[in-house]
């Protein structure tokens, strides 16, 4: 990766885990520690050439993508594969589909981890906001967000729905006890307790009395009900909206049509 960013961490710098902790961890993709990126690319030189500026921009995007869209279960490492993807700035790849695919696969993998140090990867902000908006389980007790700056003539400057959860109360209870509590509550939840369409319905989609969402979030709404494989590098997961028709304001047949999602089909 020296050809892309001009340097690479040494083996010692890239290995952010040591001893027994390292042995217990599941295998992770080769990359650079976030601390290494911060040390070497935190500030772009004031007299930087165009090539240096582009390198810093690419590394910054790599850092953000690895920490938000595709974080691994360690939370400490930026895999090289995401940096390679950023060699083409004007690509037309579907980052949203890839993010969802990666999250699905991380949820699959997390269910199979049994070590004390086992973690979960994927976009936890996306998963958290989705859950908080719909399920009365694990939802923060208090939520508020600061007023968005006024720019009435540019809807594309409006925030996304996650901004509603900008400031939340944190849970400080014992993790194991809260896990047991959440599992028990999820096992007993009823359809009537679920907020199926938190973003509004029909022509009011994205507009609530207290919040107005960025219209870019609805740009691809004609694809929301498409049944297809979602692809993210090695991971392939199926998009099966027919299982959750009520999220789209539609009647939910019961049981939904069965689709084989065996592991063999993921490869």
Q: Where is each model-derived feature located?
A:
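Structural stabilizers in ordered domains
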Residues: 1-267
């Amino acid at each position: 990766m020296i050809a892309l960013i001009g340097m690479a961490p040494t083996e010692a710098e890239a290995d952010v885990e040591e001893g027994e902790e390292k042995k217990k961890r599941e295998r992770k993709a080769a990359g650079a520690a976030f601390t290494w990126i911060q040390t070497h690319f935190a500030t772009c030189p004031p007299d930087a050439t165009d090539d240096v500026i582009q390198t810093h921009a690419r590394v910054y995007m790599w850092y953000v993508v690895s920490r938000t869209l595709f974080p691994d279960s360690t939370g400490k490492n930026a895999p090289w594969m995401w940096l390679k993807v950023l060699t083409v700035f004007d690509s037309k790849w579907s980052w949203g589909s890839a993010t969802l695919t990666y999250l699905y696969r991380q949820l699959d993998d997390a269910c199979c981890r049994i070590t004390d140090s086992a973690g979960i990867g994927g976009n936890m902000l996306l998963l958290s906001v989705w859950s908080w908006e719909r399920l009365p389980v694990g939802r923060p007790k208090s939520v508020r967000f600061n007023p968005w700056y006024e720019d009435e003539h540019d809807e594309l400057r409006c925030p996304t729905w996650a901004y509603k959860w900008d400031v939340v109360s944190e849970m400080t209870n014992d993790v194991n006890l809260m896990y047991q509590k959440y599992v028990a509550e999820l096992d007993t939840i009823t359809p009537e307790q679920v907020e199926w369409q938190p973003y509004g319905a029909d022509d009011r989609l994205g507009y609530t009395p207290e919040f107005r969402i960025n219209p870019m979030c609805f740009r691809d709404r004609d694809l929301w009900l498409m049944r297809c494989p979602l692809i993210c590098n090695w991971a392939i997961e199926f998009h099966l909206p027919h299982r959750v028709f009520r999220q789209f304001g539609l009647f939910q047949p019961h049981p939904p049509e069965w689709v084989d999602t065996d592991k063999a089909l993921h490869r």
